[in-house]
């Protein structure tokens, strides 16, 4: 009898280490292991982790004795070879541990460890059929609320419990704490139906007769009859009718509310799926205008010779209609399509518009969705189901899905900095990662925007990308007129109304009198960013961070926007005791508050992080603004993305100077993009809109380009500055950030690392220096910046940086300082 061979497997684990780990395969598992399946392995003294098999071989590890693999979780791979190749590129390019990439890629339910905690699923019912082990776990969770897998292993008396837990999660008996803590809110819509009392035909007929006899009740009668005609019946009960559908048909919302108050109608919240679009009625595609048709043909022509094409279309030019045509072509060929958007929470309208064309083929993927939905989409994409989830709409994390037949990637609003992951590692840019993903799959990539990033536009001009310009608004609509209001002059003339220039107030009143709506943009939330003592200039500061506290009136509290620390408002100066404290600056909350004093009969709402803590809150505000129930919408940059309103007569930008004066080489680029994007909300259907920008310096050159809608003029000036001062796209940048709770140790460590880097990179190293905010969450911070020539070998540069980092951490004094690496900071 021949001796059986011993095999080993390299396992990728979700730990922040730059290596895979080799484990021995038990003979009985030899036939079960293959690339891409998950296994349970021991790690450290007592942990059990879920890892991914990346290679099977016969090489015995020399540095340590290989431990045995405990269990195989999958019959088939959950990760593809192309996907793993993509992970390795992310790890290499962004200098991130491969385990961090795995962590970012996989839904939490795929990564159970012995320290994972579980609870009973909210939908679990005690009458479910359970086997003996499942019953013991359920009984234990009834007693303890939540338990980790190590504790449950002890209760069952078995070492490897993950397979049991996996099965119970799939059966919706239990839920991981990671899934529970996602604060997932099911999407719901408000519907109207008859109350039980008025389900009686005789009573209802009598009430309708009463309405018919009163001229003043005409709107109530129309509303009730529409509900009755639209409501489908199952037996004797009427199915609820969506409020949105009723309002779209011209039904008066106030009439519906009156009928509800009087007990004839009642509202119900009906939960609808976020995953598929069965809730939307399919529509015919819109006909393209000649300008759109020409742009579409140019895109197709560019795609013959380029993987990547940049579609530069002005705001309101109808880029979405082009996307629809290109998506349909790919789906018809049996391909998958990825539609990347900057923030899923801000794109309700886009999802609804695409759902109207593609129905159940759409899947929405985002890290805020619950684990069961994310796993469902993952498995469906992996299985390459020909009928479901062929079009994925998602934010950054959707680039990590296991695509099989990817034909097209669309990156909408490609300039947005929210495509860049900041913390934790990997700090990748989803736009750039999508381009690499396109190359791996031989899929076409379309970057769409009204305000291209400097890098993307340069690549297009250099011929690296295809370039298509769409310079006409849809159906010949005119671009808005843009004016600057000189607040320096108005303050001098004492014509300001608090933070509103007379020019802006006149514009607001003019728009409201014409029955139009207004959007006001201020890229700062809260009531006021700072309190200051008039005697000694003291300001209340965060105890954890080197930053002033922001006052929030609705909670009457001071809050740090960096660490979340909250404290009560102060009544006197913390330095000199004076009670002469004044508020300096203004945020969206203060604008809303003060504007309501000037315009008491106007409905004013905010759209910012504080007012949209839940998804439903965001959707309600957008829905109410769409249906003209809100007259003025005050918001941060949330109002610049993915929104399309047809009745906005005026857009006001309250503080352009704050946007332009940030200490960042991208400040002008970001300011131009934000102002052009928010200006694009004005004037959609049959009237030219108006934009008023408040500034102390109306002659500032960027404002001139914004007023003229002149992206090319802006680009030509900005690109010269970048070249002159060695910034991207002419140089690549890598930021190294060190953190330590001890400022003295941080200073020494930062200088040590800088000296090592200068041995290799000479004058290309800038720093070390404190950032604008030198302490966050009790950690002092120092930054080192490296500028590298564009044509330098990327691989060699990063190898040298890593070599210097390894030497740095070989010295004991440096080990207490935390290091993070940001390649291509954005």
Which residues fall in each region the model found?
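Accessory, non-ATPase domains that flank or precede helicase/AAA+ motor cores in DNA-metabolism machines
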Residues: 1-449, 463-477, 760, 794-802, ...
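A general secondary-structure signal for short beta-strands and their flanking turns/coil
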Residues: 4-6, 18, 187, 618, ...
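Short glycine/serine/proline-enriched coil/turn segments at secondary-structure junctions
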Residues: 31, 400, 642, 775-776
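Generic solvent-exposed, charged/amphipathic alpha-helical segments
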Residues: 88-91, 153, 505, 592, ...
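C-terminal accessory/connector segments of nucleic-acid motor ATPases
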Residues: 96, 108-122, 134-139, 145-151, ...
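Inter-lobe coupling/hinge segments of SF2-like helicase ATPases
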Residues: 283-289, 293-296, 304-747, 755, ...
């Amino acid at each position: 009898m021949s001796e059986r061979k011993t095999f080993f497997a390299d396992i990728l684990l979700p730990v922040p280490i730059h290596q895979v780990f080799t484990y021995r395969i038990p003979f009985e598992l030899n036939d079960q292991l293959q690339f891409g399946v998950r296994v349970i392995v021991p790690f450290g003294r007592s942990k059990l982790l879920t890892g991914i098999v990346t290679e099977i071989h016969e090489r015995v590890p020399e540095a340590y004795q290989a431990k045995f693999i405990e269990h195989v979780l999958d019959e088939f791979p959950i990760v593809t070879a192309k996907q793993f190749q993509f992970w390795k590129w992310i790890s290499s390019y962004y200098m991130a541990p491969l385990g961090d990439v795995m962590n970012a890629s996989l839904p939490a339910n795929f990564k159970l460890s012995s320290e994972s905690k579980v609870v009973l699923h909210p939908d679990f019912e005690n009458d479910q059929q359970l086997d003996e082990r499942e019953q013991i776990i359920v009984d234990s969770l009834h007693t303890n609320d939540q338990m980790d897998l190590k504790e449950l292993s002890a209760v069952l008396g078995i070492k490897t419990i993950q397979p049991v837990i996996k099965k119970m999660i799939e059966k919706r008996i239990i839920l991981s704490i990671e899934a529970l803590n996602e604060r997932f809110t099911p999407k719901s819509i408000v519907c109207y139906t008859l109350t039980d009392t008025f389900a009686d035909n005789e009573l209802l007929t009598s009430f309708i007769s009463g309405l018919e006899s009163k001229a003043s009740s005409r709107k109530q009668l129309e509303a009730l009859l529409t509900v009755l005609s639209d409501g489908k019946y199952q037996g004797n009960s009427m199915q609820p009718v969506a409020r949105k559908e009723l309002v779209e048909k011209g039904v008066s919302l106030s009439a519906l509310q009156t009928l509800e108050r009087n007990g004839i109608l009642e509202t119900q919240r009906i939960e609808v799926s976020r995953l598929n679009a069965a809730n939307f009625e399919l529509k015919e595609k819109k006909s393209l205008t000649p300008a759109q048709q020409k742009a579409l043909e140019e895109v197709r022509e560019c795609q013959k010779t380029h993987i990547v094409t940049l579609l530069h279309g002005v705001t309101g030019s109808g880029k979405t209609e082009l996307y629809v045509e290109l998506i349909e072509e790919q789906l018809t060929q049996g391909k998958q399509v990825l539609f990347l958007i900057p923030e899923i929470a801000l794109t309700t309208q886009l999802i609804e518009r695409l759902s109207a064309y593609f129905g159940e083929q759409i899947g929405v993927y985002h890290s805020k969705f619950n684990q069961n939905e994310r796993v469902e989409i993952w498995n469906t994409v992996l299985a390459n189901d020909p009928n479901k989830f062929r079009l994925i709409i998602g934010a950054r994390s959707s680039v990590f899905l296991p695509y099989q037949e990817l034909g097209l990637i669309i990156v909408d609003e490609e300039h947005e900095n929210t495509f860049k992951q900041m913390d934790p590692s990997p700090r990748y840019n989803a736009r750039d990662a999508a381009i690499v993903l396109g190359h791996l799959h031989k899929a076409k990539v379309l970057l769409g925007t009204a305000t291209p990033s400097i890098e993307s536009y340069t690549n297009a001009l250099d011929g690296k990308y295809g370039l298509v310009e769409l310079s006409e608004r849809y159906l010949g609509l005119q671009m808005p007129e843009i004016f600057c209001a000189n607040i320096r002059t108005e303050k001098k003339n004492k014509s300001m109304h608090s933070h509103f220039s007379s020019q802006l107030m006149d514009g607001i009143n003019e728009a409201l009198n014409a029955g139009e709506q207004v959007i006001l943009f201020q890229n700062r939330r809260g009531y006021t960013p700072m309190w200051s003592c008039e005697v000694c200039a003291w300001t209340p500061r965060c105890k954890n961070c080197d930053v002033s506290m922001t006052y929030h009136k609705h909670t009457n509290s001071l809050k740090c926007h960096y660490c979340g620390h909250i404290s009560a408002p102060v009544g006197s100066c913390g330095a000199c005791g004076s009670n002469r404290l004044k508020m300096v600056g203004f945020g969206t909350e203060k604008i809303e508050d003060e504007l309501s004093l000037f315009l008491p009969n106007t409905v004013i709402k905010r759209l910012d992080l504080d007012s949209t803590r839940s998804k439903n809150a965001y959707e309600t505000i957008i829905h109410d603004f769409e249906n003209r129930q809100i007259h003025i919408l005050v918001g941060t940059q949330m109002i610049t993305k993915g929104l399309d309103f047809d009745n906005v007569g005026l857009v006001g930008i309250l503080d352009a100077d704050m946007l332009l004066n940030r200490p960042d080489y991208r400040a002008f680029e970001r300011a131009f993009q934000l102002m052009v994007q928010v200006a694009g909300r004005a004037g959609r259907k049959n009237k030219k809109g108006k934009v008023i920008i408040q500034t102390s310096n109306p002659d500032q050159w960027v404002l001139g380009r914004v007023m003229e809608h002149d992206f090319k003029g802006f680009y030509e000036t900005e690109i010269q500055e970048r070249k002159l001062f060695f910034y991207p796209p002419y140089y690549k940048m890598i930021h190294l950030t060190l953190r330590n709770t001890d400022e003295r140790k941080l200073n020494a460590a930062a200088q040590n690392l800088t000296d090592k880097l200068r041995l290799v990179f000479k004058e290309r190293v800038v720093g070390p220096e404190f950032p604008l905010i030198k302490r966050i969450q009790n950690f002092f911070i120092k930054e080192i910046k490296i500028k590298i020539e564009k044509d330098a070998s990327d691989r060699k540069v990063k190898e040298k940086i890593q070599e210097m980092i390894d030497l740095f951490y070989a010295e004991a004094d440096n080990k207490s300082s935390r290091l993070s690496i940001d390649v291509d900071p954005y």
